[in-house]
Each structure stands twice: as C-alpha cells, then as structure tokens.
C-alpha cells in the first residue's frame, strides 16, 4: 500500500516459501500494484549438477506460485545462499564445470518455462567476502550462458551494484547485451543504498538506457540508508530524468 501511495506500480520480492501468497495477491488486487518478479531459488544451486532434478521440481512449484500472483518472471542465482553466504562448490567442481552445470540446468528448465509462459532471469552476482564461491560473476559470462541456452524464456538480469563491483563499464555491458536483458536492478555502490548515496552516475546511465529503446523493467533493489519511505523520492526522481 505504501508503494502504491508513493507512485510505484510494481514490486519484487525474494523467496516465496515464507510468504503469505494469498495475502500478497489480495493486496495487489486492492492496490493495483503487481508483482513483477520474485526469486525462484531455494536450497538448490544451478551450478551443482547434483541439484538439477531438485531444481527442476522447485521451478515447477515456483511457476505455480507465479501464476497465483499473475507474475511471469522468476529470478535465478548461479549459487543458492546459506546463512553464512553463497553455497561454495569450488572444492567439488572447476569453474568451467560450474558454468557448464548452470547452462545444463537452465537448458533443462527452459521447456518448462516456455510451456508456462514464464521467463527466468539469470543474475550474475559478485564474489566478494562470504560470497567468494559465486560461480557466475560477470555480465559477459552470464550473457554467454543465456545465449548458449537459446530459449526465449531464459534471459539475463543486470544488477548495477554487482556489475560495478565486478567490472564496471555499465552502459557498454548493458548495451552489448540489450537483446537479452529485460530487467535491471538498481542500487548504489559501495553500500547498496538508494541511488545518489554512492559512486554510480545514475543521472547519466538511466537516460542513456532509456534512449536505447529499452522497454523492460527497472527495479530498485537497495537497503535504505535511513527510513524506507524517506528513500522513495530519490528513487522516484530517476523516472523523471
């Protein structure tokens, strides 16, 4: 309700298992706010071949949840997360093997997504600190995987926070893959707070993306520096650039 009052028309959330899906659906119907995407992850990793079958079954369940919410987008990470950081499989697989596993699992999932008109977004993440074992960390590698899967229902999510930490060159990386990027996450670096609190020049970046003809979703995924609602104007301002 607060999101609707602030002038936003869609939301995203992380995992669905601990959520009251019926209440979310009812609130969306009441406010006119839609669920644009949510995480389709649980305790399984795309990069571990031993998780493939479990991941396929979990995606089927996530798709049913998505349909309840009239949502057509799931977000997938290369590695799942534990309380202490991302699951680390470096002792089990080489990096090339992990990348092959991600490609394999997404290829298995793709026909299920296509049958249900659901899109899965692969999100490369940074491998700093407790997440040192993250297997897909760059836009270029994520794009290579998505192109190898070659499904209209498997695309790439560009998270500007992770991109800036891992390699920068944000605009060129997005533009060179714009055909497979329907979704962008926004947060500033270094602390993942709202736009304007760090080093990313959103006043340059967002107009350039919009001028390219981008028609996808731009989602604010940040930890507020202060009060959540107080941060809404800083986010809303970017839509007026």
Where are the predicted features?
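Conserved beta-strand positions in the central sheet of alpha/beta enzyme cores
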Residues: 12, 37, 75, 121, ...
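Short, structured active-site "lid" loops
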Residues: 32-41
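Active-site-adjacent beta->alpha loops and helix N-cap segments on the catalytic face
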Residues: 16-29
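Residue-level detector of anion-binding/catalytic polar loops
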Residues: 9-10, 34, 72, 119, ...
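Active-site-proximal loop/turn and secondary-structure-junction residues that shape catalytic pockets
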Residues: 15-17, 41-44, 80-82, 124-128, ...
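Histidine-acidic metal/acid-base catalytic patches
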Residues: 1-5, 70-72, 136-158, 162-241
């Amino acid at each position: 309700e607060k999101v609707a009052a602030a002038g936003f028309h869609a939301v995203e959330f992380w995992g669905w298992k601990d959520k009251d899906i019926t209440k979310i659906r009812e609130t969306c119907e009441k406010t006119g706010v839609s669920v644009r995407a949510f995480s389709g992850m649980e305790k399984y990793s795309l990069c571990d071949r031993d998780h493939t079958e479990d991941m396929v079954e979990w995606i089927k369940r996530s798709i049913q949840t998505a349909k309840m919410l009239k949502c057509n987008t799931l977000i997938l990470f290369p590695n799942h997360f534990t309380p202490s950081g991302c699951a680390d499989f470096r002792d089990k697989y080489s990096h090339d093997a992990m990348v092959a596993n991600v490609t394999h699992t997404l290829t298995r999932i793709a026909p299920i997504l296509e049958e249900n008109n659901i899109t899965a977004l692969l999100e490369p993440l940074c491998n700093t600190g407790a997440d040192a074992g993250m297997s897909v960390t760059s836009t270029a590698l994520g794009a290579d995987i998505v192109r190898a899967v070659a499904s209209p229902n498997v695309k790439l999510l560009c998270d500007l926070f992770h991109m800036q930490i891992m390699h920068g060159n944000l605009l060129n990386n997005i533009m060179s893959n714009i055909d497979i990027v329907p979704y962008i996450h926004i947060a500033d670096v270094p602390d993942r707070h709202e736009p304007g609190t760090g080093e990313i020049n959103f006043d340059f970046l967002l107009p350039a993306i919009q001028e390219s003809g981008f028609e996808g979703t731009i989602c604010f995924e940040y930890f507020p520096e202060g009060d959540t609602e107080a941060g809404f104007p800083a986010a809303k301002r970017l839509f007026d650039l």
